[in-house]
Amino acid sequence: MISVAVNGYGTIGKRVADAILKQPDMRLVGVAKTSPNYEAFIAHRKGIKIYVPQQSIKKFEEAGIPVAGTIEDLVKASDIVVDTTPNGVGAQYKPIYQQFQRNAIFQGGEKAEVADISFSALCNYDEALGKKYIRVVSCNTTALLRTICTINKVTKVEKVRATIVRRAADQKEVKKGPINSLVPDPATVPSHHAKDVNSVIKNLDIVTMAVIAPTTLMHMHFINITLKDKVEKKDVLSVLENTPRIVLISSKYDAEATAELVEVARDLKRERNDIPEVMVFDDSVYVKDNEVMLMYAVHQESIVVPENVDAIRASTRLMSAEDSIRITNESLGILKGYLI
């Protein structure tokens, strides 16, 4: 049983903490919070131990939230830390993890240099075995890598061109925008996503562009893949249908908008309406000779959660990629095939 700490209990952290509680080989030591907001109250209500910075203890106690100790205490009590702090903050915490000689999993908001390896479970699990510091790539990069590495099983992927329509903010982020604008992210080519993909697949020819849209629900990707050999559409659809963490969306559902997909998640009683699988619209899959085009939706709040669970096992050498991915998927109810 591996003892896991989660530093940060926001959008990703609370989902990772809940995922750890569902694993048969992991124990959640507790979570770290810096402010006694509603998420801290809910964590306490769930019975999760809360650790805080030394200077914040009084603030939490005055709010009526018991404190189990400092963040340093949390790190010391764990075997490995999943750092889900805001972008750039994880690098500031790394010296603490080093001080107590603890392995750590970082998120895609950190620079790749913070870790020994950037990670995508379907692409490079074996390369991450035993690595002390692993960086799970961002939500968009996770979706790109899942898709690319899956299609690479049909025949070698030689070139990728992708356009990413990014959601402007998560649903709880009331101070972010835009409200009524499309914002190039950035207005130069390539966007950072290409470099991030190359942190996992070193020599792939990939160019990405991105734009921020006034929505909070999901991202959308439009990608063009050039393969080494000619392929048939049925072979591409088959590999997508039979790969875990990818689901196909049929036009028969009459649910192709991201808002409708969220409603599907509600009706399926998905926790927090999460869909951690890449959602590929099957009618969008276009194949001509060695060229493949497709579009898919990405639920940014949950797609990296199973990757974090697998990264814990890879870092601590708990088990093989196949076993870890299977156990993670089973415990979290993650599908393959068609969503409905």
UniProtKB/Swiss-Prot annotation:
Q: What is its EC number?
A: 1.2.1.59
- What reaction gets catalysed by this protein? D-glyceraldehyde 3-phosphate + phosphate + NADP(+) = (2R)-3-phospho-glyceroyl phosphate + NADPH + H(+); D-glyceraldehyde 3-phosphate + phosphate + NAD(+) = (2R)-3-phospho-glyceroyl phosphate + NADH + H(+)
Q: Catalytic residues? A: 139
Pathway listed for it is: Carbohydrate degradation; glycolysis; pyruvate from D-glyceraldehyde 3-phosphate: step 1/5
Quaternary structure, from the entry: Homotetramer.
Q: Which gene encodes it?
A: gap
A molecular-function term among this protein's GO annotations: NAD binding
Q: Where does NAD(+) bind?
A: 11-12, 109, 167, 300
Which is one Gene Ontology cellular component term of this protein?
A: cytoplasm
Give the subcellular location: Cytoplasm
Q: Return the NCBIfam families for the record.
A: GAPDH-II_archae, PRK04207.1
Q: What class of enzyme is it?
A: oxidoreductase
Q: What family is this?
A: Belongs to the glyceraldehyde-3-phosphate dehydrogenase family.
**An example Gene Ontology biological process:** lysine biosynthetic process via diaminopimelate
Name the record gives this protein: Glyceraldehyde-3-phosphate dehydrogenase
Its domain of life?
Archaea
Alphabetically sorted, this entry's keywords are: Cytoplasm, Glycolysis, NAD, NADP, Oxidoreductase
Binding, D-glyceraldehyde 3-phosphate: 138-140, 193-194
